[in-house]
Amino acid sequence: MQLSMRMMFTPKHQKLVNQCYPTGRTTDKKPKSSETSYLLYYVNSRRSKLEKVSTYLIKRSTSDLNHRRIGNIAVTLDLMNKIVLHCKENLNVFVKDFLYIMNKVLSNNNFNNDVSVVELIELAFSSICQNLDDVLCNGDMEFVQLYQNFVDLFFKIVTERIHNDDMLLKCCIDISNTNSVSSNPQLNHFVSKSVAYTISKFQERNPKFKTLSLEAALESNLGKRLSRTQTRTIGLDKAAEDNHDLSVKALQSYFNTTETDKLNLSIRTLLRCLQSTPNKELLEFVCNGIPVQLRYIVILLLVRQLSDKDKNVNPIVSLKLMSSLLVSDVSIVGLSVLDIMRKLLNFQLKNATNKEVVAQSCITMTDLNHKTYYAEQTSDMLYELLLKLKSDTVKDVEKNAVVEDIDFLVEHITQPSISLELFIDLAHYMKNHIICLFNIVETEVPSSILFSKLYSLLRELDSHGVQKEMMEEIFDKYGKMALLSGLNYFLENVSEPEYTYYSYHLQAANFLKLNDYKSQTEYKMQTRTLFTKEDLLSYYSDTGSNKYSKKGAQILLSRDNQISTSDLLSDSQVRTTPLEYKNVPNAIFSNGKAVYDNNDFAAKQNKFDNSIDDNIEEANDTVISDANAKGSIYRFVAEDARSWKTMRATAPKVSDLKKTMNEKNIPNNMKRDGSFRGSQSVKSRVTNITFLLNELKTFSDDANKIKDPDEENIVGLDKIDVARSNSLRLAPISSLSDRSSIGNRKSFLQKTATGENQNDDFKDANEDLHSLSSRGKIFSST
C-alpha cells in the first residue's frame, strides 16, 4: 500500500527512468529496450525534462554505489550513453551531471576494478567527447575541472588497477576527438600525455620501431635508392586502413589531422620520445600519416630542438633524424629551404669547435638539397654559403667549416644547377675541387666578360694538370664559345709564354681537328714563343677546314678585345674594321649604273673629322655620317664594336655627285632631259634644304640645278619649306606663322643669290594645291 502510494506521487521522469531498470541483483544487467525508447522519446519531446533526468540519475547512482548494485550502475551508464547520443544538441544541459556520475563510479574501489563497468564508462565518455562544442572547453571552468579529474582518474585506473592497454588507447582516442582540447592551456597537456602512451604501446606491439636506428641516411648509389623505394614500408596513412590495432588508430587520430595546435603538440611529443629511443623508421612511419602540406612542421621542430636548452635533447640525434627524413620517400611540400639552411649554418658556426656537430650539420645541409623544392634551390644554397665566406665577421675556423660544407654539397649534386658567375666566385675558395664544381655549371651561354674571368681564373691555378683538365671541360661544355672567346682573350691578355696559353691552343686544335695547328702549338710550346696574328689567321682563312674561320678572322682583325656574346653567336654578321670599308656606290645614274669612289669617300670622312672645329659655322651645310658627327655617341666608340644596325653604308652626298660628274667631263650646257638624279637613298636622307641650296650655289648655270626628269622647268619649293629652310639658316626655329610668311620667303631668295649674272628665281607652287605643306619632299610635280 505504501509502495503504491509512493509511486502515485512520483514525478513522471523518475517513473520513466526507474522503469528502465530490470529487477534482480545480477551484474550483467541492461536497460529494458521498450522503456528506454520511451524515455528517449520523452526527453527529446520535452527538453526541459533533461536536467531533471540527469539530476535524478545522480541520486539513483549514488544510492546504487552505496548499496554496491553493480548491475544498476551498469544500466545507469548505458542509459547515459544513449541519452548523449539522442540529445546531443542539448549536451551542455546535462553533461556536467554525467561527468560527475562517472567520476563517482571511477573513484569507488568496489567498481573501478570491474572491466565491464570501466568499458561502459569509456563508452559514455567517448560519446560525450565526440559531441562536445568549443564553449564548454574554453568557457566553463566547472566542466574543465570535471573533465580534467575524470581523465586523470581514468588513466590511473587503466594503468594501475586493470592494466588494460586497449582501454587506455580508447581513452587516448577519445581525448583526440574532443574539440579544442589542444587549444585549452588547462587541458592540452592531455594531448602530449596521450601521444606518449600511444607511441609506447605502438612500440611494444612493433618492436622494430623501438630499436636504435640512426645509420647514415645519405646514399649516393642510385640503385640502392631505387631498391629502398621499391621495398618501402607501409606508412601510417596506409596501415590504418587494413589494421585493427588500436595503437595505429590512436596515432592516426593525433597525426592525421589539420588541427595545427594538436599536430604541433603531437609532433613535439614524438620527437621527445625519439630522443630516448632514436628510430628513423618510426619517424618516417608517423610522418606518412601527417597531411602532406603540414609535414614541414616536423623539420621546423627538429631545427628548433637544436636551440633547445633542455639537457635531454641531443643535437646529433636531432640532426640525424632530420637527415633521415629529408632523404626518405616521405613527400614534403612548402619547406623553406633557405630558412632551414641559415639556422643549420648558424648552429654549426656557433659550435665550430665541436667536430661531430660540424660534420653532422654539413651532412644535414647536403641532405636538405636531396629533393628539389624549387628551380634555383641549389644555386641559392651555394650563394648563401658564399655570403658567409665573404663576411668579415666570420672567423677562420668558421670559414673552414663553410668550405667543407660547399665541398660536400657539390660532391652530391648530380645535375648542372649553378651559373658560371657563381662558379667563378666559389672557385677562389675551393681550388682543390674546382673540376667537381665546374661539372655542375649550367651550359647556358654566358657573356664575354664572364669568359674573360674564367680564363683569368684558369691562369691563377697552380697545377698544370688541373689547368689542362679544366680547359678540356670548358671546351666540352661550351664548344664554339670557348674557342672564339679564348682566341680573343689570349690574343689580348697574354704577352709572355705560359702553360694556359698553350693548353688553350692545343684544345682549340683538337676541337677544330687541325693537325697542323696542333703540331705548331707543340713546337711553340717547346720554343717558348707565341703565335702572331698572321700565324693564327692561317688557321682561320679556310672555311672548308675550319667552319669558324669567318668569326675567328673577325676577332683577329678587330681592334677591340671585348667581343660580345651576340657577335660570337651570330654567323651572318660582318664586322667592319677601321682599315676596311664596305664597297658601296657613291651615286647611281638614271640608267642604273653605280659609281664607286670609296678611297675618296674615306679621305673625306677623315678630312671632315679634322676640320669640323674650324668650320663650325658651316655645320648646317655639310652632311656628316653618324659615325663621324662630333655630337654623336658613336664618335667615341670603335667601329668594330658597334652593333650591326650602325654599320649600314653611309649615303652619298651631293658633293660626291658633283665630283663624279666633273670626272666624267659632263658639259655645263647639257640637256635637261639627260641630267642625272640622285639615288633613292639621297631622296630619303637629304632633307635639309639649306644644305641643298648651298651645294647648288657652287655649281654651274644648268648642271648645278637638280631637275625633275619629267619636267622642263625647275619645280618651285613649297612656301612652308622655303620658310623653314630660311629659319634654319638665319634664325632659331620660329612659330608656324613666321614660317609661313611670304615676306620671309622673298628676303630669303634675295640672300641666297648664287652669282652676279645668274638668275636662279624660284617659282611658287600652284595655289590651287589641296595640301598646304610638302615638308619632307624634294621633288614634286605640277
From Swiss-Prot:
Disulfide bonds: none annotated. One of its GO terms (cellular component) is mitochondrion. The modification Phosphoserine is found at S227, S564, S625, S632, S643, S675, S735, S771, S774. One of its GO terms (biological process) is protein localization to plasma membrane. The keyword Phosphoprotein applies. InterPro entries: EFR3, EFR3_HEAT-like_rpt. It holds the Pfam family EFR3. The keyword Phosphoprotein applies. The modification Phosphothreonine is found at T231, T687, T690. Keywords: Phosphoprotein. It comes from the Eukaryota. Present with 1670 molecules/cell in log phase SD medium. Belongs to the EFR3 family. This is Protein EFR3. It comes from Saccharomyces cerevisiae (strain ATCC 204508 / S288c). The lineage of its organism: Eukaryota, Fungi, Dikarya, Ascomycota, Saccharomycotina. The gene is EFR3.
